[in-house]
Amino acid sequence: MAKRRGQPLDGVLLLDKPVGLSSNHALQRAKRTLDAAKAGHTGTLDPFATGLLLCCMGRATKISGAMLNADKTYRATLQFGEETDSGDLTGNIVARAPEDFPGVEEANLREVLSRFQGSIEQIPPMYSALKRDGKPLYEYARAGIELERPPRRVMIYRIELLSFTGHQAEIDVACSKGTYIRTLAQDIGRALGCYAHLFALRRTQVGPFSLDRAVTLDALQAMTDPKAALLALNELPAGLLPAT
């Protein structure tokens, strides 16, 4: 029988996921660096996105359900003038504003953003991991098949304009589980009448955990003792771990 690889570590690593890696790839690199036997993450970030990825080791994987259901906070950059099939910069352009599009006026943008605060309905994107008949929607999308998706109600607790250039805007969004920031960007563009897609995304908070305490993969791999980056079980907020 093959020997089980890794050490039985327990704890949470707050990882600042770099651009270009899938969440699972980032998790596996962290797991190897820590030499952990068991690891899982608590919510996928797209490869183009960066920011807070909770990597749970050993018994800390028991918080995964709570963190999947937790509220999240993001910093998102919207690109105005073009809509893509995926809702982000990785997709194919499917609609464009006129060539003489002058950009968005700040007053209009602020007014539109205010409409998206509170309880809103979103239609999940085709490029998502939601399943239909056991198959992820993105597989249908890649085959050129568009399926009807019922809208889902989500909560936008805060949506704040951080910076603005006319053709791009950076916003801070605090939202409930199941919120698609790509869809939010697309819907904002449609409400403005000029189209938009998500140009960049950075997750800054998951439940009680903040990006402020996160470590990059490079920094983790450079540490003399990478295990020192783990939050121990007794450091986790009270009530997060289920009773044993």
UniProtKB/Swiss-Prot annotation:
To which species is this protein native?
A: Bordetella avium (strain 197N)
**Which EC numbers does the record give?**
5.4.99.25
Q: Which residues form a coiled coil?
A: none
In terms of CDD domains, this protein maps to:
PseudoU_synth_EcTruB
Q: Which residues form the active site?
A: D46
Q: What is this protein called?
A: tRNA pseudouridine synthase B
Alphabetic keyword roster: Isomerase, tRNA processing
Citing just one GO molecular function, the answer is: RNA binding
Per its UniProt record, what Gene3D superfamilies does this chain match? Pseudouridine synthase (3.30.2350.10)
Kindly state which reaction or reactions the protein catalyses.
uridine(55) in tRNA = pseudouridine(55) in tRNA
Q: Could you tell me what this protein does?
A: Responsible for synthesis of pseudouridine from uracil-55 in the psi GC loop of transfer RNAs.
Checking InterPro entries in the record gives: PsdUridine_synth_cat_dom_sf (IPR020103), PsdUridine_synth_N (IPR002501), tRNA_psdUridine_synth_TruB (IPR014780), TruB_C (IPR032819)
Q: Which family does it belong to?
A: Belongs to the pseudouridine synthase TruB family. Type 1 subfamily.
Name one process (GO BP) from the record: tRNA pseudouridine synthesis
